């Protein structure tokens, strides 16, 4: 049996989102579970309109309550808000 956290990691985006935190290398975020980890642990600041929407959207996509691509779109908006896109 696959655990719920393993199932959450199976949900992937068709196209990963490339972000850069600070002066670090470009990192590819593959799906909503990974995006949630970035939003919670690696984001330059917590809060913000799109940060909060991305967190809830990614959680909803992981539990199949929302579209995976909608979660990707709001994650991209959060990355733009945090100046993480090149």
Which residues does each predicted region cover?
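A short, structured beta-strand/loop element
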Residues: 16-53
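Homeobox/homeodomain signature
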Residues: 7-9, 29, 52, 58
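Short, compact, well-ordered microdomains
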Residues: 53-86
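Short secondary-structure boundary micro-motifs
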Residues: 1-3, 27, 44, 67-68
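Generic secondary-structure microfeatures
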Residues: 5, 21-23, 79
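Short, charged/polar N-terminal "headpieces" of proteins
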Residues: 1-16
């Amino acid at each position: 049996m696959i655990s719920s956290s393993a199932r959450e990691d199976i949900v992937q985006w068709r196209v990963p989102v490339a972000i850069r935190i600070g002066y670090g290398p470009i990192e590819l975020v593959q799906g909503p579970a990974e995006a949630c980890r970035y939003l919670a642990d690696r984001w330059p600041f917590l809060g913000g309109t799109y940060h909060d929407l991305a967190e809830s959207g990614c959680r909803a996509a992981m539990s199949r309550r929302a579209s995976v691509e909608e979660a990707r779109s709001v994650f991209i908006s959060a990355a733009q808000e945090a100046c993480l896109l090149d």
